[in-house]
Design a protein with these regions (language model features):
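N-terminal secretory signal peptides that target proteins for export/translocation
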Residues: 1-27
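N-terminal hydrophobic alpha-helix used for membrane targeting or insertion
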Residues: 6, 12, 33-34, 115, ...
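Compositionally biased, low-structure terminal segments
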Residues: 10-13, 31, 69, 139
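Generic detector of low-complexity/intrinsically disordered segments
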Residues: 11-14, 38, 43-44
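N-terminal processing/targeting junctions
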Residues: 15-19, 36, 144
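Hydrophobic alpha-helical context, especially transmembrane and signal-peptide helices
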Residues: 28-29, 75
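Bacterial N-terminal signal peptides
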Residues: 29-41
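Low-complexity, acidic/polar, glycine-enriched regions of mature
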Residues: 46-218
Length: 218
């Protein structure tokens, strides 16, 4: 199965520019990434099997800034990959979707009330505005080999109604594909949170990690 996956990735990378296929509903959330599951979804084309959404996730690291940042908190935010699709005609393409409302702070050092407050603010109009932008989407445009079980996955990431081109290095271990990239909130029309006159704030740059699992038997 893994040989077939690698062969599929390699052959597509050598000769096919993958085009985004259908207009997807725009989403707003820290990323993404999901963005990044391009390699995993493309891999499943070898057997036309789905990704394992139960074991596929997006994780975002949000960092504090400002004069009094020592009194603030960094945050780890996570959401499952909601769905993915492979289109074989008229041209090969892949898509990923994350439901923005599924994002939750994992911060173990925060009490439950504080985590709930962080999540409410994150999903609200001030940041993600999930009522208006319920999903994050990614559609691949090209995949280039970068070594053994490694690829550079390029695609279009849509957050908060803004689409940006991104390229993410992806590594495979067994059936799991992992990638990491950094994005800026302002690139997607999101103003980083600032409180107390900016003495405590969130950095514009976010680190985004993903883990995509191919379904058993595919």
């Amino acid at each position: 199965m893994h040989t077939a996956i690698g062969t599929t990735l390699g052959s597509l990378a050598r000769g096919i520019d993958i085009a985004a296929v259908r207009h997807m509903s725009t989403g707003r959330c820290f990323v993404v990434a999901t963005i990044l599951g391009g390699a995993a979804l493309l891999a499943t084309q070898a057997t036309a099997g789905p990704i394992d959404v139960r074991n596929s996730k997006l994780t975002v690291f949000v960092y504090k800034a400002g004069l009094f940042s020592a009194f603030a908190d960094n945050h780890v935010i996570s959401a499952p990959i909601a769905s993915g699709a492979i289109v074989t005609a008229p041209a090969p393409a892949i898509e990923l979707v994350v439901n923005a409302a599924d994002l939750v702070p994992l911060d173990p050092d925060l009490d439950p009330a504080k985590r709930a407050e962080v999540r409410t603010r994150m999903l609200g109009e001030e940041v993600l505005d999930t009522g208006k932008f319920p999903t994050i989407t990614f559609a691949s445009t090209a995949i280039e080999p970068a070594g053994s079980d490694r690829w550079n996955v390029s695609g279009r990431l849509t957050i908060h109604g803004v689409t940006k081109a991104v390229t993410i290095p992806v590594v495979r271990a067994d059936r799991v594909y992992r990638g990491e990239t950094r994005i800026r909130q302002r690139d997607f029309g999101i103003n980083p949170i600032r409180i107390a006159g900016g003495t405590v704030s969130v950095k514009d740059e976010l680190k985004v990690e993903f883990e995509i699992s191919a379904a058993e038997g595919n």
